[in-house]
């Protein structure tokens, strides 16, 4: 799974719109937060995920199985997110993370990205 999008929020390229950025979720961690310290608060599940960015799918694939850090694009606004995780859902953590990523990239009055699509 991966997505493509356009953005002007890359480090070192601020204000320059880069089209066809290829984003892939590299890792997902699901955490359960117990209500031990405060019994009135229910148990919470959170999903933490890291996003790796490349200039395009072609450039990502050309760099091999494990691309070097030098081949990646950087953006503090796009590289790490958290979301609520639903353990009762039929979808896996990666699917939930991708759905959340698409929503967060397009959200707000000044969205981080545009033309978001599955790759």
Name the predicted role of every residue range:
Residues 1-46, 52, 56-119:
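Viral virion structural and adsorption modules
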């Amino acid at each position: 799974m991966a997505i493509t999008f356009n953005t002007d929020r890359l480090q070192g390229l601020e204000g320059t719109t880069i089209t066809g950025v290829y984003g892939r979720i590299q890792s997902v961690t699901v955490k359960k937060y117990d209500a031990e310290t405060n019994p009135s608060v229910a148990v919470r599940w959170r999903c933490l995920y890291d996003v790796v960015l490349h200039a395009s799918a072609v450039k990502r694939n050309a760099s091999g199985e494990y691309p070097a850090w030098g081949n990646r694009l950087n953006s503090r606004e796009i590289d790490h997110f958290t979301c609520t995780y639903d353990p009762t859902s039929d979808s896996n953590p990666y699917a939930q993370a991708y759905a959340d990523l698409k929503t967060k990239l397009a959200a707000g009055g000044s969205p981080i990205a545009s033309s978001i699509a599955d790759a």
